[in-house]
């Protein structure tokens, strides 16, 4: 992403946008200096179902507890069990369940209920 920005390209980035906030700040600074755009590719927030959910939640009143779960079996899991840690499972490379799947939950929760 940084190389694309440095070469005067607008960038759409697949999740996770970066591994940490420092990296994100660096990308934003580079984009701003060059008057370029960076976008995170997650589009859930713009689907009709999500927009409807967001409106319907307002009718329920004060929400006390929310539980989100998103899981799936990975076609790479057998490789992982054999000891070969691919990037999707390597937290040193912004992988692992939190960054690979649960980032969807976090994005949705923040959009629906705000930051606390």
Regions found by a protein language model. Name each.
Residues 45-116:
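Predominantly a Rossmann-like dinucleotide-binding segment in NAD(P)-dependent oxidoreductases
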Residues 1-45:
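Beta-strand-loop-alpha-helix segment that lines the small-molecule cofactor/substrate pocket
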């Amino acid at each position: 992403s940084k190389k694309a920005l440095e070469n005067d390209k607008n960038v759409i980035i697949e999740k996770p946008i970066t591994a940490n906030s420092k990296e994100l700040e660096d990308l934003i600074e580079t984009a701003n200096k060059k008057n370029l755009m960076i976008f995170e590719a997650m589009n859930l927030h713009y689907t009709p179902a999500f927009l409807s959910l967001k409106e319907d939640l307002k009718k329920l009143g004060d929400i006390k507890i929310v539980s989100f779960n998103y899981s799936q079996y990975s076609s790479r899991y057998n490789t992982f069990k054999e000891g070969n840690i691919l990037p999707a499972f390597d937290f040193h490379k912004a992988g692992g369940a939190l960054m690979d799947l649960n980032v969807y939950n976090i994005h949705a929760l923040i959009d629906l209920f705000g930051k606390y």
